[in-house]
């Protein structure tokens, strides 16, 4: 689907957002098929998109696990699907995290087990939680670290290259054949990982496993914030819920 039409549809989805997409994180057993938990929601969502159906009842009826601790949730699925389309990637190649560093650690662990060289390049500053010495001395991860100005400065590497950038707009990616993984971080929102190239497809299940077992997807509120900025849509609902949660805590 052409980018502008897709974003117009996403904007309409946000305007008709089911309240459960923000509030409900337990199983909807009446519409949940565990065997298709990772694919069923997006398959049905794409049908609605193609027919430009953003009716609240249609969105509410989409089958999903509604469990961001394990498999992702409706808004993380929509965010990942949107970013994948904007960057001409398969939706499974885009994975969101509440953490800024979990995706990086998942890749480093896989490389340690496989004995693969790793180059981490970054623009600006690394995430505060990224402790180079701890990763090397305690976890035994091996990697080269290099600061660059942009993706054009990333050179070919005998191994795998992770590109980290901190920015407000998590969807902005300048693709390069010299980069295997893009990690877009935002201290207030989390991070988004983009897996580049068919040769890296095998990493996806391992990274999803880490998110499922050790962390969570970007939260519903933060996904809504990101999608709202992307589509120039206000999201008072997200702000209201966030402030209410802070009060309860």
Which positions does each model-derived feature cover?
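Conserved N-terminal alpha-helix of the aminotransferase class I/II PLP-enzyme fold
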Residues: 2-105, 109-249
């Amino acid at each position: 689907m052409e980018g502008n039409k897709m974003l117009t549809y996403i904007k309409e989805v946000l305007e008709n957002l089911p309240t459960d997409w923000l509030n409900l994180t337990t199983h909807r057993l009446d519409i949940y098929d565990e065997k298709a938990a990772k694919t069923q929601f997006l398959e049905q969502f794409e049908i609605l998109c193609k027919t430009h159906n953003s009716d609240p009842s249609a969105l509410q009826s989409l089958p999903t696990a509604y469990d961001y601790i394990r498999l992702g949730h409706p808004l993380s699925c929509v965010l990942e699907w949107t970013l994948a389309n904007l960057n001409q990637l398969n939706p499974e190649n885009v994975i969101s995290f509440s953490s800024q560093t979990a995706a990086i650690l998942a890749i480093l662990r896989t490389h340690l087990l496989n004995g693969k060289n790793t180059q981490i390049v970054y623009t600006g500053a690394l995430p505060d939680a990224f402790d180079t010495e701890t990763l090397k001395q305690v976890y035994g991860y091996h990697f080269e670290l290099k600061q660059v100005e942009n993706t054009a400065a990333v050179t070919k590497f005998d191994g795998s290259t992770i590109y980290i950038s901190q920015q407000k707009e998590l969807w902005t990616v300048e693709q390069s054949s010299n980069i295997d993984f893009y990690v877009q971080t935002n201290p207030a929102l989390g991070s988004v990982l983009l897996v580049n190239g068919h040769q890296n497809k095998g990493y996806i299940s391992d990274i999803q496993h880490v998110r499922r077992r050790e962390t969570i997807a970007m939260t519903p509120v933060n996904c809504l914030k990101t999608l709202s900025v992307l589509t120039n849509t206000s999201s008072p609902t997200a702000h209201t819920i966030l402030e209410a949660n802070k009060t309860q805590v």
